[in-house]
Amino acid sequence: MTLAAMTAAASQLDNAAPDDVEITDSSAAAEYIADGCLVDGPLGRVGLEMEAHCFDPADPFRRPSWEEITEVLEWLSPLPGGSVVSVEPGGAVELSGPPADGVLAAIGAMTRDQAVLRSALANAGLGLVFLGADPLRSPVRVNPGARYRAMEQFFAASHSGVPGAAMMTSTAAIQVNLDAGPQEGWAERVRLAHALGPTMIAIAANSPMLGGRFSGWQSTRQRVWGQMDSARCGPILGASGDHPGIDWAKYALKAPVMMVRSPDTQDTRAVTDYVPFTDWVDGRVLLDGRRATVADLVYHLTTLFPPVRPRQWLEIRYLDSVPDEVWPAVVFTLVTLLDDPVAADLAVDAVEPVATAWDTAARIGLADRRLYLAANRCLAIAARRVPTELIGAMQRLVDHVDRGVCPADDFSDRVIAGGIASAVTGMMHGAS
């Protein structure tokens, strides 16, 4: 089956479900992935997704139950900024905002939605903590969904069981979604999105603890991701990065299948043997007693978690969740360095020395001299373009980074001064 035939068949949903469209080989799958991973168009839209850990202020060692959290959300009216609310495997709450016309509109909408969600949870005796990793509680899954049950089983059967459980239930992030932009600029744009990763991780690192202990890392969240299978969670770029669609296709076909959904029952089960998707699509292995379909391929792509993921747009996935005082400035900085063409050109030079320093950024952050210099250069570029509404947040971030301080340092200081429980409770009550 050619790509054109496969795509046409997959789009005829009135006559045939995509589950019925079998992919004949890995070449067709690769073409399907590469051709659909980014969409040609102008820059400008920004979408934000923000996760926060849900705690009980009266007992921060307790993990609120699925029933407690969902009862609040069931009574929640539509949010003013249009965000959709969901619950992560460990009970973290996520706000997923719609695409907005520009970064300022996206920040404003998310700020309004956060305020409504916080108020609703507070009325139920619960609170939100914006940290990259849960500093207090052991990993426990509370979301009963079949996808997360299968994901848990997959990680338990692999060498990444411990970090997999931590990733699912004990981490929280800010995700920034941006237009892919004009096709002729895709390669440079995707390369820069990756190259900015270590510097932005160092700026926003906010997870010095996990499960009641200091980890020795500024971004324990990023460390957790680094401990997992690089075939699923590592950067997607090939040697040159000149062809992001081809790189993404190779990455996706090499990655092992995590779970399979039955087209008849929609039951989801974990794949506990190591089966690269290419083996399934080429018929070397049958899963669920059959060959792979378009629906299987589309679902497989949702189980891959690189730091920059193409989904027609770009998902930037490497930022720790950070407090209100700085997250608007962090988001503005990243968006400006990617979407403003002059700022992007300057950023390429600023981050080139540390473009692959992912582990160093997560471990010691701004204590690394090269990351410190890159971070200050990037913030200077963004600060020259900051709108009036964000001057205060940007100045706080600039001052912090100039002193070599990230949010993880602030949280660590509060833990040392008053204990973990007090520091967590303080964040629910507004301490930054």
Curated annotation (Swiss-Prot):
Domain of life: Bacteria
Catalytic class of the enzyme: ligase
The keyword Nucleotide-binding appears for this protein: yes
Any one of the GO CC terms: plasma membrane
Alphabetical list of SUPFAM superfamilies matching this protein: Glutamine synthetase/guanido kinase
Pfam families: GCS2
Metabolic or biological pathway: Amino-acid biosynthesis; ergothioneine biosynthesis
Activity control summary: Weakly inhibited by L-methionine-S,R-sulphoximine (MSO) and strongly inhibited by D,L-buthionine-S,R-sulphoximine (BSO) in vitro.
Alphabetized InterPro entries for the sequence: EgtA_Actinobacteria (IPR017809), GCL_bact_plant (IPR035434), GCS2 (IPR006336), Gln_synth/guanido_kin_cat_dom (IPR014746)
Gene Ontology MF terms: ATP binding; glutamate-cysteine ligase activity
Keyword presence, Ligase: yes
Transmembrane parts of this sequence: none
Family statement: Belongs to the glutamate--cysteine ligase type 2 family. EgtA subfamily.
Note in the entry: Was identified as a high-confidence drug target.
Described function: Catalyzes the synthesis of gamma-glutamylcysteine (gamma-GC). This compound is used as substrate for the biosynthesis of the low-molecular thiol compound ergothioneine.
HAMAP family: EgtA
Protein name stated in the entry: Glutamate--cysteine ligase EgtA
Lineage: Bacteria, Bacillati, Actinomycetota, Actinomycetes, Mycobacteriales
